[in-house]
Amino acid sequence: MTITQLKVFVKIAETGSFTKAGQALNMTQPAVSHAISAIEAELDVKLIIRDRRNGLMLTDTGKQILVHIREVLKGIEKVEQVAAAEKGLELGTIHIGTFSTASAYFMPKLISEFKQKYPKLELVLHEGTVNEVKEWLHTRMIDVGILLYPTEEMEYIHLKKDKMAVVLRDDHPLASHSAITLKDLDHEPMIVCDGGYESPFIDMFRQAGATLHPAFTVYNINTSISMIREGLGLAILSEMSMSGMPLPEHVVTRELDPQVYRDVQLAVPSLKEASLAAKLFIEMAKELFGAE
């Protein structure tokens, strides 16, 4: 197997298309097909199947091999980075996974500062839900990811303590309170953001002796606030998610009592095994946000 063949396989897995993989790698479609055929012939296994409904799909074996091929390619990139560093150069690509709130809060400043200091390093941003970022880290699709609520499989660097608040209409009875307890919300219809936030919320209510009653599950903060404006429920949102977002008329926030924070953290599968480029990115993130 050649490095080019490995890159072709990864790109097909990411794009779900021979044509798009060829365009991304500046290769013809026959060359892409030949690269995959060569890998499958050498390994004597089927890696990719064509499904009428879902298009190109990885086989179970293909999914397992994808993780290891990504590790091989990252290892090759580390070798190139070490050689470049010896010459006084910084080269490489860093794949960063993040959810939308963190993208808006951290990425503009972080990317701007990083590109000024390391202009030859390429940053590729992958935006999804918290659960998708976790999956991308597990499959080594990304080098670093911004996450909430740590898991044992990753190593973490603290970025920010993000304060939570109750968001509700100004004519709701609880709006007269200066602070609201989770017990106060026990029987209230709650609008919950999906994608990795819901389970910690359920645990948070349970620990307070209350029960979370999701009335609606949404994926977007703007949707949540619009539904609150129409009197469809309340939400617990973070200050970071609402920063720079003026609340519409009749929508207000109230503090939680006791105050609740969520930890926003930079996650990597292994700090020791991270590439030189990824370590530079992590150090920059710590410099800019580590004290928050």
From Swiss-Prot:
Family indicated by similarity: Belongs to the LysR transcriptional regulatory family.
Cystine bridges: none
Molecular function as annotated in GO: DNA-binding transcription factor activity; sequence-specific DNA binding
GO cellular component terms attached to this protein's record: cytosol
DNA-binding region: 18-37
Entry keyword set: DNA-binding, Transcription, Transcription regulation
Name of this chain's protein: Uncharacterized HTH-type transcriptional regulator YvbU
HTH lysR-type domain location: 1-59
GO annotation (BP), single: regulation of DNA-templated transcription
PANTHER family: HTH-TYPE TRANSCRIPTIONAL REGULATOR CZCR, HTH-TYPE TRANSCRIPTIONAL REGULATOR YBHD
Database matches in Gene3D superfamilies: Periplasmic binding protein-like II (3.40.190.10), Winged helix-like DNA-binding domain superfamily/Winged helix DNA-binding domain (1.10.10.10)
SUPFAM superfamilies linked to this entry: Periplasmic binding protein-like II, Winged helix' DNA-binding domain
